[in-house]
C-alpha cells in the first residue's frame, strides 16, 4: 500500500487507528503508533466547551508526548460550536481535526450529533464549511454509508465533504441503524471512492491481514481505518502492513512478547490515569488481550477484583508464568492472530 497524504502530513502505510471513545486514549495511541499504525486519532471530544473542565474531557485532550501528527476528533450538531471547538483544539496542539458523523451511539445521536447528522445534509454542509473555515490545519471526516438501508446517502455526503474542503474521508461500511450488527458492506465505499478525489479510508470488520487486502481490493480505498480489531491486539497494524507489502503473514506473537506489550500498556495506563482510575481502565484492556487464551475467563474474574497497580502487574506476570499455553496448549505459546 502506498503512502497517503492528508494536507502536509503523510500516513506512510495508509493504516489509521480509528477513534474509539473509552479506548483510544493517549497510552493506547502511543502503543499503536509503536506497533505500526501510520496515524492515530484521539477519543471523541464534545464540541460543548462548557464541559471541557471535567476530568474525563481533559484526559481526552491532546497531551505532551502524543505522536505527531496529532489528530483530534470532535462531535456536535451546531456549526458555530463545532468551529469554535476545532479552533480551540488547534490552539491546544491539534494538527488535524476529525469530524465525527459516524458514531451510532444513542447518547450521541440523541443530541443530533454523530451519524444522526446524516439525516440533514444541509446541516452537514454548514458544519463542514464552518470548521474548515475556522482552522488552518487539515479537516477530515468520518461517516457511515447512511442513516438506514433505505437512506444510504454516504455518496452525497462525500461529495458535500469534498466541496467543503475536507481533506480525507473515512467511511464505515454500515448505516447508523445497523449499529455494529451484521456484516459491513463495501460497495458503497467503492462508489464513494470513485466519486471523489480526496483520500478515502475504508472501515468496518477489518480484523485480519487477509481481510485488509480484501477490503482494499473491493473498495479501491486509499487506506484503512482499524478500530475494534486493535483492542487487545495493537500489533495488528504491523501484521497488516507486512502482509500487504510481502503477501506473507508474520509469525504469531510468542506469549513472552504479548506479556511485555501488555505490561507496558498497563504501566502507561497507571501513570496516565493515576492509581485508582488507572486500575479500573486497565481491566477492560486486560480482558481484550487475554480473550482468546485458555484460563482467561477465570483470570479475569480474579483480576477485576484487584484494586492496586502492583497487584495487577504481578497477577499478569503470574498468569503468563504459570504456563499460559495458548489456543493449542503449546509450550511458549503463540497468540493466535
Curated annotation (Swiss-Prot):
Necessary cofactors: FMN
Record-linked Pfam families: Dus
Signal peptide stretch: none
Record key words, sorted: Flavoprotein, FMN, NADP, Oxidoreductase, RNA-binding, tRNA processing, tRNA-binding
Enzyme Commission no: 1.3.1.-
Record's catalysed reaction(s): a 5,6-dihydrouridine in tRNA + NAD(+) = a uridine in tRNA + NADH + H(+); a 5,6-dihydrouridine in tRNA + NADP(+) = a uridine in tRNA + NADPH + H(+)
Molecular functions (GO terms): flavin adenine dinucleotide binding; FMN binding; tRNA binding; tRNA dihydrouridine synthase activity
Top-level lineage group: Bacteria
Binding site for FMN: 19-21, 73, 142, 203-205, 227-228
Annotated InterPro entries: Aldolase_TIM (IPR013785), DUS-like_FMN-bd (IPR035587), DUS_fam (IPR001269), DusB (IPR032887), DusB-like (IPR004652), tRNA-dHydroUridine_Synthase_C (IPR024036), tRNA_hU_synthase_CS (IPR018517)
Catalytic residues as annotated in Swiss-Prot or TrEMBL: 103
Leading EC class: oxidoreductase
Alphabetical list of CDD domains matching this protein: DUS_like_FMN (cd02801)
Its job: Catalyzes the synthesis of 5,6-dihydrouridine (D), a modified base found in the D-loop of most tRNAs, via the reduction of the C5-C6 double bond in target uridines.
Family: Belongs to the Dus family. DusB subfamily.
The protein's name in its UniProt record: tRNA-dihydrouridine synthase B
Annotated organism of origin: Pseudomonas syringae pv. tomato (strain ATCC BAA-871 / DC3000)
Gene of this entry: dusB
